[in-house]
């Protein structure tokens, strides 16, 4: 494979091919990469027929099954061998693509990524990382749902992987890594957090700044926030819900009378910039860090812009060879990881 090739689950998400196909094609056109659109051939080709394809490298790979949102990931993995999410993962495993993007069943994406694409040697638990807006620059929050029960050395490895991601994808030379807890002071938190803190403190090749609290997530004072998947998913969904609710309240108040409407008109450019900063579609999806190849798991409600951003993120991950940095970090801290495991036994 010469050019970057990204396999896209065309059947994933609430809107399926109608948004996945144009989003993936836009990324291929602007980025000069190739996309493999995996799904029901007839439905995918119907969407392609609506889009100019001059100079765009697109190939349709048929998959006869779709992972249902109400199905268990284990059932999808065992029984739906021709589900689009399984097919995209096999394309990567067999060397036909460099990475995948899916807005479908997130649990199935994680399971298929782990068991078909495989983990980076030394990584025990791949983690979902979410890029989130703050007052200053975006941060990486992980894990946001792949692992609800974790051990201290898992959190430590999450931080190592996110460090490489933040450097390559967000451009932070020395990412500041914080551990999410109930207080900033060393010694605050539950047993998991306190023991993970000790591992981070002993690491020599990362910029660990200590504990951070929930209120610090959006200040931009750190670049990476590490937590287990239960806490991370709650934090992510809480921020999404708060953002949506506040946007509705703001819109209602701004349209409540003549003067608010006039002020809104005068500040329109500022509101547009704000909307762009908090728009999840700008960030695409959550990378599943720790796999042999990159997998981007998108929100089920993703629009074409979000799919395009996710494909671009996957391509950047591949082109910057971020997985090599992940492997190096895991290997360099292998002894410390073993120490963390031994302490827990």
From Swiss-Prot:
One of its GO terms (biological process) is phospholipid biosynthetic process. One of its GO terms (cellular component) is cytoplasm. The keyword Transferase applies. It is found in: Cytoplasm. It catalyses: a fatty acyl-[ACP] + phosphate = an acyl phosphate + holo-[ACP]. GO terms for molecular function: phosphate:acyl-[acyl carrier protein] acyltransferase activity. Keywords: Cytoplasm, Lipid biosynthesis, Lipid metabolism, Phospholipid biosynthesis, Phospholipid metabolism, Transferase. It holds the Pfam family FA_synthesis. Pathway: Lipid metabolism; phospholipid metabolism. Its main location: cytoplasm. Its EC number is 2.3.1.274. Homodimer. Probably interacts with PlsY. Catalyzes the reversible formation of acyl-phosphate (acyl-PO(4)) from acyl-[acyl-carrier-protein] (acyl-ACP). This enzyme utilizes acyl-ACP as fatty acyl donor, but not acyl-CoA. Belongs to the PlsX family. This is Phosphate acyltransferase. It comes from Nitratidesulfovibrio vulgaris (strain ATCC 29579 / DSM 644 / CCUG 34227 / NCIMB 8303 / VKM B-1760 / Hildenborough).
């Amino acid at each position: 494979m010469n050019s970057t090739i990204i396999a896209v689950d065309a059947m994933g998400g609430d809107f399926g091919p109608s948004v996945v196909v144009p989003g993936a094609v836009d990324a291929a056109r602007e980025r000069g990469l190739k996309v493999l659109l995996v799904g029901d051939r007839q439905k995918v080709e119907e969407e392609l027929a609506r889009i100019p394809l001059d100079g765009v490298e697109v190939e349709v790979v048929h998959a006869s099954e779709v992972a249902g949102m109400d199905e268990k990931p284990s059932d999808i993995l065992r029984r739906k061998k021709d589900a689009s999410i399984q097919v995209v993962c096999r394309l990567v495993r067999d060397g036909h693509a460099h990475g995948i993007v899916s807005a479908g069943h997130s649990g199935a994406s994680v399971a298929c990524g782990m068991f078909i694409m495989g983990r980076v040697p030394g990584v025990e638990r791949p983690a979902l990382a979410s890029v989130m807006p703050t007052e200053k620059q975006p941060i990486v929050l992980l894990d946001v749902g792949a692992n609800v029960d974790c051990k201290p050395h898992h959190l430590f490895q999450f931080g190592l992987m996110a460090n490489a991601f933040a450097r390559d994808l967000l451009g932070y030379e020395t990412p500041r890594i914080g551990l999410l807890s109930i207080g900033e002071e060393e010694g605050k938190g539950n047993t998991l957090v306190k023991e993970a803190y000790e591992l981070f403190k002993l690491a020599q090749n990362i910029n660990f700044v200590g504990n951070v609290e929930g209120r610090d997530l959006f200040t931009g004072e750190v670049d990476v926030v590490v937590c287990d998947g239960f806490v991370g998913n709650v934090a992510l969904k809480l921020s999404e819900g708060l953002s949506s609710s506040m946007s509705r309240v703001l819109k209602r108040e701004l349209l409540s009378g003549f003067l608010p409407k006039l002020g809104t008109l005068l500040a329109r450019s500022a509101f547009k910039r704000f909307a762009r900063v908090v728009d999840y579609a700008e960030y695409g999806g959550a990378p599943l860090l720790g796999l042999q190849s990159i997998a981007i798991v998108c929100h089920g409600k993703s629009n074409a812009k979000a799919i395009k951003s996710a494909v671009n993120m996957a391509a950047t991950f591949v082109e910057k060879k971020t997985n090599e940095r992940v492997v190096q970090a895991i290997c360099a801290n292998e002894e410390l990881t073993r120490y963390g495991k031994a302490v827990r036994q």
